[in-house]
Amino acid sequence: MPNPPEISTEARRQALAKAVDHRKQRAEFKRELAEGKRFWREALDSEVEAIQRMRIKELLESLPGFGTIRAVAILDRVGISHTRRIQGLGSTQRAKLELELKGR
């Protein structure tokens, strides 16, 4: 297995700080979603990189009344991979997901 690319200590520190910031942003968004302060559609329409890189399964599991089983069932019905990220949704997948979540 090849070695990872060599980067400076400063570049590594910046990348780690960015990763921590993105995790905090996603956690805050999911918390607000669970509390009903945000709507799931905001994630699909978001241009924030941290939100765009969230997995669809995580988004669904954050909705009130949803758990892993319900989230996986919806993903299977709609034909979306369990590891698909918001930014990777195709237009057909997005339309099917929106139809499935209509009224929630």
List the model feature ranges, each with a label.
Residues 1-62, 68-104:
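Structure-specific DNA junction-binding interface
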